[in-house]
Each structure stands twice: as C-alpha cells, then as structure tokens.
Amino acid sequence: MKKEMTTFAAMSLMRYYRKGTVRKINKWLGKQPTDPYMKFKEIEFFSELLTNLQPVRCLEYGSGISTPFFLKLLPDNAQWHSVENLPKWYDIVKAQLTSDRIHLHLVDAKEDPNQEAATDVYANFAEQLEGEFDFILVDGINRENCIDVADKYLAKNGLLVVHDANRVQYHSHIKQFKNWKIIQDFRKTAGGFGLASNDLDLEKLVSWNEHSQAWKADTNISNFFKFKFLIGGGKPFKLEHS
C-alpha cells in the first residue's frame, strides 16, 4: 500500500509540475492564462469538488477571470454570482466574461478587520440577490465575516468553501459549522481549502486520501528544497476535520 501511495503521489506531482512549467513559459511569452490562479493541485481538488457537488446557484466573494473555467463543470442551468469590491478589477473581469450565466456585482466596500459581520455590506450582499445558494466560495475581502454569515444564505445541503485556508485566522470561523474539513500545505498566507456545511457529508465530495497523498508529497518537497527543515520553519501538511 505504501508503494502504491508513493506511486500515486509521484504521478500527481509530475502532472502538477509539468502544468506549472507550461504556465510559467506562457507567462514569460506574454500569453493570458485561462486556468484559475491557483496551484494545479488546488485546481484538481476544486474541479473534482464542483463536478461531484453540481451546484445550480453559486455565490463567489472575490471575482476572477477563472470563473468560466469552473462554470464548464456545472449543470447547464447553473448561475454564478460574483461579488467584487475593486472597480478596476471589476472592469477587467467584466470585459472578459461572455457567459450570460455569470453575474458580476460591484460593491462599495473595503477590507476592514473591525467591521462587524451583521453590518458588513460586502458579506451580506447576498440579501440583494434573494434566495439561497447551493455553493458559496469565499475568496475576497472580510473573509471572516463572509464565513460567519454564510449559513443564512446556504440552501439545504449547501456547501461553503474558503480559499487560502492556510491562514489560521479563518479556522475558528470555519469550525462553527457542524461538518468541516481544512486541508493545508506548506504555505502560510495563501492556498489551502476549508469546507463547511451543516448538512452535507464532506467525505463524499472529493477523494480525500488521494489528494492528501499528493498535497503531503508536494509539501515535503517544497520544505526540502527551500531548506526549511534546517531552520525549523517548515510547515507540514495537515488535514483537519470535525
């Protein structure tokens, strides 16, 4: 079993690193990326999650040009609402969107760690969209507030996903839900996912064992080549759950 796990992780890493190299070459050549601005292990994780969940009504805090990439994985009747607070970035994203199933919303709000969740117009913008959501992605500003108010906007069997869950300040907020999982790698300020729901069985959403093998191997390799193991600064792979 150990040999099989090692083989699986090695094959996954080869795939991730190959795609990462192509992305860097294309960036050097000035080509506009079409894949999400995530590490490829995160793209595969997130893609499998959406494919299995098949949400119809989606809400995203923090818009991105990668939204059409993920929309292709959803049902034909899926609608994706994206909330953005930066006018210039809003214009950039809007200019590249062609699907009438993606709805971009500009909200006058700023990052404010002292803003209370109940009065946060950014976190509570979902009230203006009416109805509940099958899926909510938190990847913008005031993330703690967005997590704290998410439950009142989630439909039955709805799922909350928090990107950059390597940031420990999000963990206590994610853990307020009945069911939660947090997968982390070697990074401290970016990457990682937190999943939460009061209804869903999170075990069935992705192949946790397989992804854990690959994420752990990637973390070990990164810590080694950055010599973090010598100075005690290496951050280990971690998968926590409720």
Locations of regions flagged by a protein language model:
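A short alpha-helical cap/connector motif
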Residues: 1-135, 142-155, 159, 165-242
